[in-house]
Amino acid sequence: MVYLSQDYIGELPKTHTSVSDFDLSSLPRDPNELFTQWFEEAVAHGIGDPSAVTVATVDEHGRPDARMVDIISLDEKGFHFGTSAKTAKVSQLEQVGAAAMCFWWQPLRRAVRVRGTASRHFDGERLNVWCVKPEHFEFTFLWDDRLHSDRVIYTLDEFDHWDRIRLQR
């Protein structure tokens, strides 16, 4: 049984707005600066809930789990988000100590993936604040044809400096 056909989904309208080209020649050395620039452009263009992010973890059996949260802040320590103290997410973060995050600002055709070490930043009775310290960023800019993209990957080297790789599809 097909619940949502490929034809049906393929005919849905795709709304997107070109803000600007992804100028690969002027990328900052620090991916946090590029993230901040993209975030501020999403806010300026009225993107709903630009702070919404999918946070992915794994359970004790290695099965992935993902859910939506809102980031509270981004600073030199990483991305901060709040969660109820007694959730599967907290248990998984405590056990594994790592998380992945994915921001998707669809109307701008931009996505940012982040992977890093997760640690508890604030331990409350009912609320915890967690921090994901990025070790890997991937910025994706989809072209108008939606078949091609520019991607830039930042990874931390052994000296805590960011290396950049540009990929084009």
Question: Model regions: which residues?
Answer:
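Binding-site signature for planar aromatic cofactors or substrates
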Residues: 1-169
